[in-house]
């Protein structure tokens, strides 16, 4: 770890304590992950890869599904947090490899939601008969076809 990065990690660590009275934020979670993946962090977290984290993502997604099916809203909140952690973890690994940043993932999904909801976000589409799911699928197929042509 470079000197400046090590100093940043040390300075960040002081903000994270079990007794912290303030609520944590998404940026806090991202910083916690940076610390966990740093040289001063957790050996298990440091050695994880995209591939080794797949079972964790699947497990957490399954636990979200189970909480929904059981109408267990208290557990749902916790399980959604666990699933969010997986997303942030993947983005942190991607950023470390110079692939993309968390902000890129947020930008990508935001743009996709706007594109796939043209009736809501000012697209030039006629009113539909309530089959917005069909519209979503048509737009999705068109996007995939366009992406396959450009790759």
Feature annotation, model-predicted:
Residues 1-79, 85-151:
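Flexible "arm" and connector segments at domain edges
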